[in-house]
Amino acid sequence: MKRFAALLLAVLLLGGCAPKEPQESRYQATFLELFDTVTTIVGYAPSEEAFRETSEAIHHALASYHQLFDIYHTYPGVVNLKTLNQSAGIAPVEVDGKIMELLKFCREVYDATSGKVNIAMGSVLQLWHEARESGIADPANAKLPEEAALEEAARHTDLSQLILDEEAGTVFYADPEMHLDVGAIAKGYALEQVCKTAPEGLLISVGGNVRATGAKPDGGSWVVGIQNPTGEEGYLHTVEVEDISVVTSGDYQRYYTVDGVSYHHIIDPETLYPGRLWRAVTVLCPDSGLADGLSTALFLLPQAEGQALLDKFGCEALWVDGDNHLHYSPGFRDYIRT
């Protein structure tokens, strides 16, 4: 749900700026139902039929992940994360290998970010989600979640209570009140898995999680714009990318207002409230799932701690602070289009 408008717009406007080979034409496919957001695939192909086959194969693969990682809906014959949440504390549930691999990856991101990205925060995030939806629907009566409710929910966010039995292929929540929410990672992770078998030379955006699968057929780079969080026209920067992901977390994407103060959706596990260090963080990283997690973690960390995390994985970032000043990791400027 986060980060789609700005980067998607950039994909649509900037994706075809470089020249293409004469024998191939630029095509674009858009799908609306995956991960409750917009998926756009841009690429070059010798014919519309050839591009359609490619885009439909990608859509089919993403749809499988969408159903498995969904925490809100059930699907015939599919055991998904909603199934797991409903089975908390009852019994181990046999899951598809894709769910097992996602949860293992989420645990790795949790460890790497010292708990700043915690998929076991579902109970806390649900309280904020309900308050935000109610506040958007009825702004005059918008309220914050009750402090006592947040503190009670936070008692059920211990990721060690998630028991993964790889040999049996089962998942069990030892805490019956624990609830998983993989929104900080799921889209990027799914996109990365699909891109492992996708053709080279595509630009794919899933809710703004942008992944290039290589240079264009003529060797040119894709160009992606980074939105100004102030809402002003134009981009903070445009970056040239080939085999890399571009993911942004920002305070301007999903929020509501209570007593004149905006409250966005990126919740700090330590405070149980929205992070206030940054307005936006954009991450450049070869792995889209990791980029998704890092963009959330860096949004909640001081720059020095965020930079140390980037150094660990060889990724780059752009931070926008509360005064709309820009801060760069050492290698970020190498991607900026001049």
Residue ranges with predicted function:
Residues 4-338:
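Mature catalytic core of soluble alpha/beta enzymes
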